[in-house]
C-alpha cells in the first residue's frame, strides 16, 4: 500500500462532522471545512503562479494555524515542505532556502526584515507570501489571507504519488544543515507502526474513511514544541491525518501557564514536548499552582529529541496520575527506534527504550552487536526510512547503509543493547551538541569565535546541564597581546549566529587544543570545560 497525505486529506474531510475544529490559536478557530477550502485555494494559487509539482516551499513561521494550512496545501498540490529555524539569522536562513532550491516562501510578518535582506539573494524564489494582517505589505509579497480566499475551494485535480516528498532540515552532527527527504509512504508508515501493536490500524484509504465514520474524528493535540522541528511537526501531522484538532500556543516561547490553561479550556488530550527543557518549566508551573488547573482531559504526553528524566516524569505524574508519558527515541533520519512508556505505577529509567524488530545495533565495521553485550554500538533502523539527504550523496551514503540486504538509517547514536532488546542511549558518537533539542555544530560556533580579534583558536563542546541537557561551552586561546572578555565573545557570536548557538560559558586556557596533525582534542577540552563549569556552580 502506498500513501499520500494529500489523498488522505481528500478522503477524510468529507466524513468529518460539520463545524469540527481543525486548528485553534487562542480565540481563533478554523473548522475542517474552512481549512479544506483555504488549503485547496492556496495550493491551486501556487500551482497556477509558477510552482510545479515537487517544488520546494519554505516555511518561515512560528507555531500558528497557517503553518498547518500551508502544509495541507503543499500535500494537496504535490509541493515539498521545507522547514527553517525561525531563530536563525539571515545568512543561516539563506542557506536553507538556497540549498533546498525553494521556489515559494511563506513567512510570518515578524520576519519581514530578514526577508527583505534575503529577497535579492534568492532569485529562484518565485512567490513570497506573508502571513500577517496585510498592512503595509511589501511590493513583492503576497497576502496569505487573500490567497486562501481566492477560488472555489474545490479539491485539486491532480494525481499524487507515494514518493511525493517532505523535507526536514536538520542541524545534523557535522557540516551545514542537511535536508532529509521523506517520502509520504515511508513517513505514513512511521505513524502506523506503533499503533499496529495496539490493535487494528486502517491500512487503506477506504479503511481509514470507515474508521472515522465509526469512531469519529481524532483527538485534540498541542504541539508545544516548534512545528519547524520533527517532534512537533510529525505529532501534528499524525493528528491531522486522523481528523483531529491541532491547538497552537500564542506565546513566542514556552509559557507553561498558557499551556496548562489551554489544556483546561480546550479539553486537550495529547501534548508533544522536547524533554526536560519543556517538562521542567511545565512542572514548575504545576508546583507553583497545585490543583490550579483542570487536567482531567489529558491522556498522554509524548517527547522526543532530548532527555526526559525519570525524576521529572514521576513528579509530573503526581499532578496528573491518569496520563501516559511516552518518550520516543528517534531522529530526523529515523522515526521509531524505540520508546519508553511511563505511568504512575510503572516508572522507567532515564534513557532506556524498548525497541522493535526493525532495530539493530552495529559496530563501526557494520557487524551486529549481540544482545546482552557490554559493547556499545550504533543504533540502526531498518524500517521505513528517508530517501537520503538532498543534494548530498556522500553524507547519504554514510548515514543510509545497506547491510545484509537491508537498508538502514544510522544517524550516529551510541547505545548498549540488553538481553531483552532494551536500549540504553549513550549519546551521539560525534561532537554534536544537543541543547534543549537544538542541534549545534561546534565548528560553526568555533569559526564565529575565531573571527574576533582576541581569539587565536577555539573549540566548542557540550557540557552536561540540568536545564538545557547540554550547555554550549567555548574554550579559547587568547591572541597575543589581547584581553579576554567572555561576555563580549558571547555577544559577538550572537551577532553572527542564532542566539541558542552562543556559548553559555566561555573559558580561556586549558589543555592543548590540537594534536600535532591539527586534529581537535575535544575529549580533553570537554574534561577541562566540565571542571571549569563546576567551579562556577
Language-model regions, residue ranges each:
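Conserved AMP-binding A3 loop
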Residues: 31-33, 165-201
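Structural core segment of the AMP-binding/adenylate-forming
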Residues: 48-49, 79-146
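Conserved beta-loop-beta connector loops within the AMP-binding
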Residues: 360-380, 419-420, 482-486, 520-521
Amino acid at each position: 500500500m502506498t500513501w499520500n497525505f494529500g489523498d488522505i486529506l481528500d478522503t477524510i474531510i468529507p466524513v468529518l462532522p460539520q463545524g469540527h475544529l481543525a486548528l485553534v490559536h487562542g480565540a481563533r478557530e478554523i473548522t475542517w471545512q474552512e481549512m479544506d477550502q483555504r488549503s485547496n485555494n492556496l495550493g491551486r494559487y501556487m500551482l497556477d503562479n509558477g510552482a510545479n509539482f515537487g517544488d520546494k516551499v519554505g516555511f518561515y513561521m512560528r507555531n500558528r494555524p497557517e503553518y498547518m494550512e500551508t502544509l495541507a496545501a503543499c500535500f494537496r498540490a504535490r509541493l515539498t515542505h521545507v522547514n527553517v529555524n525561525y531563530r536563525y539569522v539571515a545568512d543561516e536562513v539563506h542557506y536553507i532556502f538556497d540549498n533546498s532550491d525553494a521556489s515559494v516562501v511563506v513567512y510570518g510578518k515578524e520576519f519581514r526584515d530578514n526577508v527583505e535582506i534575503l529577497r535579492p539573494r534568492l532569485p529562484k524564489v518565485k512567490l513570497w507570501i506573508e502571513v500577517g494582517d496585510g498592512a503595509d505589505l511589501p511590493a513583492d509579497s503576497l497576502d496569505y489571507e487573500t490567497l486562501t480566499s481566492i477560488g472555489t475551494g474545490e479539491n485539486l485535480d491532480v494525481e499524487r504519488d507515494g514518493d511525493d516528498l517532505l523535507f526536514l532540515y536538520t542541524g545534523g552532527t557535522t557540516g551545514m544543515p542537511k535536508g532529509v527527504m521523506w517520502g509520504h509512504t515511508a513517513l505514513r508508515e512511521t505513524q502506523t507502526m506503533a499503533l499496529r501493536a495496539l490493535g487494528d490500524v486502517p491500512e487503506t484509504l477506504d479503511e481509514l474513511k470507515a474508521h472515522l465514520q465509526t469512531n469519529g474524528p481524532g483527538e485534540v493535540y498541542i504541539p508545544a514544541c516548534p512545528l519547524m522541528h520533527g517532534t512537533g511537526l510529525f505529532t501534528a501531522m499524525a493528528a491531522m491525518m486522523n481528523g483531529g484538532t491541532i491547538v497552537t500556543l500564542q506565546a513566542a516561547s514556552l509559557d507553561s501557564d498558557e499551556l496548562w490553561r489551554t489544556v483546561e479550556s480546550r479539553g486537550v488530550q495529547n501534548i508533544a514536548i522536547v524533554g526536560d527543557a519543556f517538562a521542567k518549566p511545565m512542572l514548575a508551573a504545576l508546583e507553583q499552582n497545585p490543583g490550579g488547573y483542570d487536567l482531567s482531559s489529558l491522556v498522554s504526553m509524548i517527547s522526543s529529541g532530548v532527555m526526559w528524566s525519570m525524576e521529572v516524569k514521576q513528579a509530573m505524574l503526581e499532578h496528573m496520575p491518569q496520563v501516559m508519558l511516552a518518550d520516543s527515541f528517534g531522529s530526523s533520519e529515523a522515526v521509531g527506534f524505540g520508546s519508553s512508556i511511563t505511568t504512575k505505577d510503572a516508572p522507567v529509567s532515564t534513557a532506556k527504550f524498548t525497541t522493535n524488530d526493525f532495530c539493530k545495533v552495529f559496530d563501526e565495521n557494520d557487524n551486529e552487536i549481540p544482545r546482552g553485550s557490554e559493547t556499545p554500538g550504533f543504533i540502526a533502523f531498518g524500517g521505513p526510512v528517508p530517501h537520503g539527504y538532498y543534494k548530498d550523496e556522500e553524507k547519504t551514503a554514510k548515514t543510509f547503509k545497506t547491510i545484509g540486504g537491508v537498508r538502514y538509517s544510522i544517524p550516529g547514536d551510541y547505545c548498549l543493547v540488553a538481553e531483552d532488546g532494551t536500549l540504553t542511549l549513550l549519546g551521539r558518537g560525534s561532537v554534536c551538541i544537543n541543547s534543549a533539542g537544538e542541534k549545534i555544530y561546534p565548528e560553526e560556533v568555533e569559526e564565529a569565535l575565531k573571527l574576533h580579534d582576541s581569539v587565536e583558536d577555539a573549540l566548542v563542546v557540550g557540557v552536561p546541564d540540568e536545564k538545557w541537557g547540554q550547555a554550549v561551552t567555548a574554550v579559547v586561546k587568547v591572541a597575543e597581546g589581547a584581553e579576554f572578555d567572555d561576555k563580549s565573545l558571547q555577544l559577538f557570536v550572537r551577532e553572527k549566529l542564532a542566539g541558542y548557538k552562543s556559548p553559555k560559558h566561555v573559558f580561556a586556557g586549558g589543555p592543548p587544543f590540537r594534536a600535532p596533525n591539527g586534529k581537535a582534542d575535544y575529549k580533553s577540552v570537554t574534561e577541562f570545560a566540565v571542571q571549569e563549569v563546576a567551579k562556577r556552580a
